[in-house]
């Protein structure tokens, strides 16, 4: 299921079904910002995730995440591409995208909302999120009108970086800032012109402008012997540091990519086929790992008489949990081709063998509970009794 909308180059918004290998690789997405509750990131060795665990509720303070998501999106656009998604791609993800554009382009909430709406017409942030975005607009405006404090802080950070790195080139940084100033001036002219016509920014008329956006107006450009390496600290601010050990960093990245794409990692040790017709369905690599739940004690509405079924007696006579007795009876697989092809409508349904049409399991975008008690969302669940496990011939 391909539910991705491009806002501008390297910046996408979508829904939960968009988080699958085919879509992420198709749009060259390297960073995924997941703004939804109870989400378990997948393929963390291949993609970089930022999980904002919040509900789409008026009581949620989403504004406190704007700085963190801004830095993450900047990093993602620099490295390749970034996808911001929530469950439906309507409220939470749209709010994060609007906040990013407001700060990145120094424009109003109305103009930023227009840009995201042109890319994805179904967006509809809840009223509380809109109020927070308008409050954020006032904060950004205040910072622009009183830049001395911000500039002073930036100068202090730059001084610290100069002490650590003698190869820092301030002239190139000035050139980078001037390029962003030129873009902002050109964009302001476009906005003023379009505001005379229903006060709406037309993405078609500003495509060329967006293509010239520098990846980060706040990043430091270094000389050819150094490379800026952004690091996300606990306070959600990215400190720009420079390093001359690019060969080591590159080698490490290559090793990770080779490891994740090697035949051994791709195939795994086993393949799994339909028990009825022996049609190959998925591999070890497609099975999702999850933290084991507490077994029957996770089901609140029944089996209360078995709350101690997974406990044994320790040396001191105390009851201890025996996790080895909690067994997962199903495989939860990732969004591979055969499973995604059966999710063309609705929020949940059954999974069938593509060859003999035998029922294999079920799928649900909202998630299902494993027999061990863990909640998996989204879920593509196949009971182990429906498939045969076979060795992969190499």
Swiss-Prot record:
Top-level lineage group: Eukaryota
Pfam families reported for this sequence: DSPc (PF00782)
Positions of the Tyrosine-protein phosphatase domain: 2-142
Parts of the chain that traverse the membrane: none
Active site: 86
Leading EC class: hydrolase
EC numbers for this chain: 3.1.3.16, 3.1.3.48
Substrates-to-products reaction catalysed: O-phospho-L-tyrosyl-[protein] + H2O = L-tyrosyl-[protein] + phosphate; O-phospho-L-seryl-[protein] + H2O = L-seryl-[protein] + phosphate; O-phospho-L-threonyl-[protein] + H2O = L-threonyl-[protein] + phosphate
GO molecular function: protein serine/threonine phosphatase activity; protein tyrosine phosphatase activity; protein tyrosine/serine/threonine phosphatase activity
Record region (Disordered): 147-191
InterPro entries: Dual-sp_phosphatase_cat-dom, DUSP12, Prot-tyrosine_phosphatase-like, Tyr_Pase_AS, Tyr_Pase_dom, TYR_PHOSPHATASE_DUAL_dom
Classification via SUPFAM superfamilies: (Phosphotyrosine protein) phosphatases II
Keywords on record: Hydrolase, Protein phosphatase
SMART domains: DSPc
Biased composition (Acidic residues): 153-188
Family stated for the protein in its record: Belongs to the protein-tyrosine phosphatase family. Non-receptor class dual specificity subfamily.
Biological role stated in the UniProt entry: Has a dual specificity toward Ser/Thr and Tyr-containing proteins.
Name the UniProt record assigns to this protein: Probable dual specificity protein phosphatase DDB_G0281963
Top-level taxonomy: Eukaryota, Amoebozoa, Evosea, Eumycetozoa, Dictyostelia
């Amino acid at each position: 299921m391909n539910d991705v909308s491009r806002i501008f180059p390297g910046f996408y918004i979508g829904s939960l079904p968009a988080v699958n290998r085919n879509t992420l690789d198709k749009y060259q997405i390297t960073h995924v910002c997941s703004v939804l509750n109870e989400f378990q990131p997948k393929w963390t060795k291949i993609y970089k995730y930022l999980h904002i665990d919040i509900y789409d509720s008026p009581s949620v303070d989403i504004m406190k995440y704007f700085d963190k998501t801004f830095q993450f999106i900047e990093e993602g656009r620099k490295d390749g591409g970034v996808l911001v998604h929530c469950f439906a791609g309507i409220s939470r993800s749209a709010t994060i995208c609007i906040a990013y554009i407001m700060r990145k382009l120094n424009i109003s909430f109305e103009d930023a909302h227009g840009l995201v709406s042109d890319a994805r017409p179904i967006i509809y942030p809840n009223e509380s999120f809109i109020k927070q975005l308008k409050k954020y607009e006032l904060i950004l405006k205040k910072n622009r009108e009183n830049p001395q404090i911000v500039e002073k802080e930036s100068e202090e950070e730059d001084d610290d970086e100069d002490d650590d790195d003698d190869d820092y080139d301030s002239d190139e940084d000035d050139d980078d800032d001037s390029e962003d100033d030129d873009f902002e001036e050109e964009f302001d002219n476009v906005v003023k012109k379009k505001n005379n016509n229903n006060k709406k920014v037309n993405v078609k008329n500003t495509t060329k402008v967006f293509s010239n956006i520098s990846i980060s107006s706040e990043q430091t450009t270094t000389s050819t012997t150094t490379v800026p390496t952004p690091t996300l600290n606990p306070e959600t601010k990215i400190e720009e540091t420079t390093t001359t050990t690019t060969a080591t960093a590159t080698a490490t990245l290559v090793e990770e990519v080779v490891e994740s794409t090697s035949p051994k990692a791709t195939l795994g040790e086993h393949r799994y086929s339909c028990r009825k017709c022996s049609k190959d369905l998925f591999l070890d690599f497609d099975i999702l790992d999850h933290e084991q739940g507490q077994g029957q004690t996770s089901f609140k509405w029944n089996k209360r008489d078995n709350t101690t079924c997974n406990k044994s007696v320790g040396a001191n006579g105390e009851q201890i949990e025996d996790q080895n007795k909690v067994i997962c009876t199903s495989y939860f697989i990732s969004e591979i081709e055969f499973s995604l092809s059966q999710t063309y409508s609705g929020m949940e349904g059954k999974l069938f063998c593509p060859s003999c049409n035998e029922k294999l399991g079920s799928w649900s975008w909202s998630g299902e509970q494993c027999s061990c008690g863990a909640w998996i969302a989204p879920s593509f669940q196949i009971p182990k009794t429906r498939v045969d496990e076979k060795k992969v011939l190499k």
